[in-house]
Amino acid sequence: SEAMLSTARSVIRTCLQVRREEDVLVITDPETAEVGQSLYEEAARVTDRILLVMMPPTQKPGKEPPLPVADIMRKNRVIIIATKDSLTHTRARQQATKEGARIVSMPGIGRISFETGGMTADYNALQREISGMGSVFRRKRRVRVSSPSGTEIEFLTGGRWVLEDNGICNRPGQIANLPAGKVFVFPKEGSMNGTIVIDGSWEGILLEEPLSLNIEKGMVVNIS
Protein backbone atom coordinates (compact mmCIF):
# COMPACT_ATOMS: atom_id res chain seq x y z
CA SER A 1 0.00 0.00 0.00
CA GLU A 2 1.03 3.64 -0.37
CA ALA A 3 1.00 4.03 3.43
CA MET A 4 3.51 1.18 3.82
CA LEU A 5 5.75 2.56 1.08
CA SER A 6 5.62 5.99 2.72
CA THR A 7 6.83 4.54 6.03
CA ALA A 8 9.49 2.49 4.24
CA ARG A 9 10.67 5.67 2.49
CA SER A 10 11.10 7.34 5.89
CA VAL A 11 13.15 4.39 7.19
CA ILE A 12 15.42 4.32 4.13
CA ARG A 13 15.89 8.03 3.51
CA THR A 14 15.51 9.65 6.94
CA CYS A 15 16.42 7.06 9.57
CA LEU A 16 19.18 5.23 7.70
CA GLN A 17 20.03 7.88 5.09
CA VAL A 18 21.00 5.14 2.62
CA ARG A 19 23.39 6.21 -0.13
CA ARG A 20 23.59 4.97 -3.70
CA GLU A 21 26.91 3.14 -3.28
CA GLU A 22 25.91 1.23 -0.13
CA ASP A 23 25.06 -2.46 0.21
CA VAL A 24 21.67 -2.91 1.89
CA LEU A 25 20.34 -6.14 3.43
CA VAL A 26 16.68 -6.55 4.40
CA ILE A 27 15.96 -9.57 6.64
CA THR A 28 12.38 -10.75 7.01
CA ASP A 29 10.34 -13.89 7.75
CA PRO A 30 6.95 -15.22 6.57
CA GLU A 31 5.04 -13.24 9.22
CA THR A 32 6.65 -9.90 8.33
CA ALA A 33 7.21 -10.44 4.60
CA GLU A 34 4.84 -7.64 3.56
CA VAL A 35 6.84 -5.09 5.55
CA GLY A 36 10.11 -6.52 4.22
CA GLN A 37 8.88 -6.20 0.64
CA SER A 38 8.00 -2.52 1.06
CA LEU A 39 11.42 -1.81 2.60
CA TYR A 40 13.08 -3.63 -0.28
CA GLU A 41 11.13 -1.63 -2.86
CA GLU A 42 12.04 1.71 -1.31
CA ALA A 43 15.70 0.78 -0.83
CA ALA A 44 15.84 -0.27 -4.49
CA ARG A 45 14.89 3.30 -5.46
CA VAL A 46 18.15 4.48 -3.86
CA THR A 47 20.60 1.66 -4.59
CA ASP A 48 20.72 -1.43 -6.78
CA ARG A 49 22.98 -3.12 -4.21
CA ILE A 50 20.01 -4.44 -2.27
CA LEU A 51 19.28 -7.97 -1.05
CA LEU A 52 16.06 -9.29 0.49
CA VAL A 53 16.46 -12.42 2.64
CA MET A 54 13.55 -14.42 4.06
CA MET A 55 14.50 -16.71 6.94
CA PRO A 56 12.44 -19.16 8.99
CA PRO A 57 10.96 -17.73 12.23
CA THR A 58 13.39 -18.17 15.13
CA GLN A 59 10.44 -18.92 17.47
CA LYS A 60 11.85 -16.80 20.32
CA PRO A 61 13.64 -13.45 20.73
CA GLY A 62 17.43 -13.62 20.91
CA LYS A 63 17.79 -16.95 19.12
CA GLU A 64 20.58 -16.93 16.53
CA PRO A 65 19.56 -16.73 12.86
CA PRO A 66 20.65 -19.50 10.45
CA LEU A 67 24.39 -19.45 9.68
CA PRO A 68 23.98 -18.27 6.05
CA VAL A 69 22.03 -15.25 7.34
CA ALA A 70 24.66 -14.49 9.99
CA ASP A 71 27.40 -14.73 7.34
CA ILE A 72 25.71 -12.34 4.95
CA MET A 73 25.02 -9.86 7.78
CA ARG A 74 28.76 -9.39 8.23
CA LYS A 75 29.16 -8.36 4.59
CA ASN A 76 26.64 -5.50 4.41
CA ARG A 77 26.97 -1.88 5.52
CA VAL A 78 23.25 -1.31 6.07
CA ILE A 79 20.98 -3.95 7.63
CA ILE A 80 17.23 -3.73 8.19
CA ILE A 81 15.80 -6.46 10.41
CA ALA A 82 12.01 -6.80 10.10
CA THR A 83 11.29 -10.14 11.79
CA LYS A 84 8.68 -11.44 14.22
CA ASP A 85 11.26 -12.12 16.93
CA SER A 86 14.11 -9.79 17.79
CA LEU A 87 17.63 -10.43 16.52
CA THR A 88 19.01 -7.42 18.40
CA HIS A 89 20.59 -9.44 21.20
CA THR A 90 22.25 -12.11 19.05
CA ARG A 91 25.91 -12.79 18.32
CA ALA A 92 25.14 -12.40 14.60
CA ARG A 93 23.93 -8.83 15.15
CA GLN A 94 26.84 -8.02 17.48
CA GLN A 95 29.35 -9.30 14.93
CA ALA A 96 27.75 -7.26 12.14
CA THR A 97 27.93 -4.17 14.35
CA LYS A 98 31.59 -4.88 15.08
CA GLU A 99 32.21 -5.05 11.32
CA GLY A 100 30.77 -1.53 11.00
CA ALA A 101 27.22 -2.16 9.83
CA ARG A 102 24.49 0.24 10.88
CA ILE A 103 21.34 -1.62 11.78
CA VAL A 104 17.66 -0.84 12.19
CA SER A 105 15.58 -3.51 13.94
CA MET A 106 11.78 -3.71 14.02
CA PRO A 107 10.90 -6.85 16.00
CA GLY A 108 7.28 -7.94 15.74
CA ILE A 109 6.46 -5.34 13.10
CA GLY A 110 3.25 -5.93 11.16
CA ARG A 111 1.25 -4.12 8.52
CA ILE A 112 -0.92 -2.16 10.97
CA SER A 113 1.96 -1.07 13.21
CA PHE A 114 4.03 -0.19 10.12
CA GLU A 115 1.30 2.00 8.62
CA THR A 116 0.24 3.79 11.80
CA GLY A 117 1.49 5.14 15.11
CA GLY A 118 5.14 5.73 15.90
CA MET A 119 6.44 4.40 12.60
CA THR A 120 4.86 7.36 10.80
CA ALA A 121 6.70 9.94 12.93
CA ASP A 122 8.71 12.78 11.42
CA TYR A 123 12.07 11.46 12.62
CA ASN A 124 13.95 14.68 11.87
CA ALA A 125 11.55 16.57 14.16
CA LEU A 126 11.71 13.76 16.71
CA GLN A 127 15.52 13.97 16.76
CA ARG A 128 15.33 17.66 17.71
CA GLU A 129 12.76 16.99 20.43
CA ILE A 130 14.68 14.06 21.91
CA SER A 131 17.92 16.08 21.86
CA GLY A 132 16.21 18.81 23.87
CA MET A 133 14.91 16.31 26.42
CA GLY A 134 18.34 14.68 26.65
CA SER A 135 20.01 17.98 27.46
CA VAL A 136 17.48 18.54 30.26
CA PHE A 137 18.34 15.16 31.79
CA ARG A 138 22.06 15.95 31.62
CA ARG A 139 21.57 19.16 33.59
CA LYS A 140 19.31 17.70 36.27
CA ARG A 141 20.12 15.24 39.04
CA ARG A 142 16.73 14.70 40.69
CA VAL A 143 13.84 13.28 38.66
CA ARG A 144 10.18 13.04 39.65
CA VAL A 145 7.68 11.13 37.50
CA SER A 146 3.91 11.22 38.02
CA SER A 147 0.90 10.16 35.96
CA PRO A 148 -2.91 10.31 36.22
CA SER A 149 -2.97 6.51 36.64
CA GLY A 150 -1.09 6.78 39.94
CA THR A 151 2.62 6.61 39.14
CA GLU A 152 4.56 8.72 41.64
CA ILE A 153 8.31 8.12 41.87
CA GLU A 154 11.47 10.07 42.58
CA PHE A 155 15.10 9.15 41.93
CA LEU A 156 18.57 10.62 41.42
CA THR A 157 20.41 10.19 38.13
CA GLY A 158 23.80 10.33 39.80
CA GLY A 159 25.31 11.95 36.72
CA ARG A 160 24.77 8.80 34.65
CA TRP A 161 25.01 8.78 30.87
CA VAL A 162 21.86 9.52 28.89
CA LEU A 163 20.92 7.53 25.79
CA GLU A 164 18.84 9.26 23.16
CA ASP A 165 16.70 6.88 21.10
CA ASN A 166 15.69 9.11 18.19
CA GLY A 167 15.52 6.65 15.29
CA ILE A 168 18.36 8.25 13.30
CA CYS A 169 20.93 5.58 12.41
CA ASN A 170 23.39 7.11 9.95
CA ARG A 171 26.86 6.19 11.27
CA PRO A 172 28.84 2.91 11.13
CA GLY A 173 28.24 0.67 14.13
CA GLN A 174 24.98 2.34 15.14
CA ILE A 175 21.86 0.34 15.96
CA ALA A 176 18.30 1.58 16.42
CA ASN A 177 14.99 -0.06 17.22
CA LEU A 178 11.97 1.37 15.45
CA PRO A 179 9.59 2.91 16.25
CA ALA A 180 11.82 5.19 18.34
CA GLY A 181 11.24 8.13 20.64
CA LYS A 182 12.76 7.60 24.08
CA VAL A 183 15.34 9.06 26.43
CA PHE A 184 17.04 6.59 28.78
CA VAL A 185 18.79 7.37 32.04
CA PHE A 186 19.78 4.94 34.80
CA PRO A 187 18.65 5.84 38.33
CA LYS A 188 21.40 5.93 40.93
CA GLU A 189 21.34 2.65 42.87
CA GLY A 190 19.19 2.85 45.98
CA SER A 191 17.77 6.28 45.16
CA MET A 192 14.35 5.40 43.70
CA ASN A 193 11.26 5.53 45.89
CA GLY A 194 7.55 5.51 45.11
CA THR A 195 5.04 3.65 42.97
CA ILE A 196 5.00 2.77 39.27
CA VAL A 197 1.58 1.98 37.78
CA ILE A 198 1.48 0.13 34.45
CA ASP A 199 -1.98 0.37 32.90
CA GLY A 200 -1.37 -0.44 29.24
CA SER A 201 0.58 -3.52 28.29
CA TRP A 202 3.24 -5.78 29.79
CA GLU A 203 5.62 -7.73 27.55
CA GLY A 204 3.32 -7.17 24.58
CA ILE A 205 0.16 -8.33 26.39
CA LEU A 206 -2.69 -5.91 27.17
CA LEU A 207 -3.39 -5.71 30.89
CA GLU A 208 -6.94 -6.28 32.11
CA GLU A 209 -6.24 -4.23 35.24
CA PRO A 210 -3.37 -1.91 36.26
CA LEU A 211 -0.16 -3.35 37.69
CA SER A 212 1.40 -1.47 40.63
CA LEU A 213 5.04 -1.77 41.70
CA ASN A 214 6.02 -0.28 45.06
CA ILE A 215 9.69 0.70 45.22
CA GLU A 216 11.80 1.49 48.28
CA LYS A 217 15.47 2.47 48.03
CA GLY A 218 15.70 1.13 44.50
CA MET A 219 14.10 -2.26 45.23
CA VAL A 220 10.63 -3.49 44.29
CA VAL A 221 9.07 -4.45 47.63
CA ASN A 222 5.50 -5.17 46.53
CA ILE A 223 3.59 -5.93 43.32
CA SER A 224 -0.19 -5.73 43.14
Language-model segment annotations:
Residues 1-208, 212, 216:
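Active-site bordering "gate/hinge" segments
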Residues 206, 222-224:
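Dual-mode signal for accessory low-complexity, basic/Gly-rich regions
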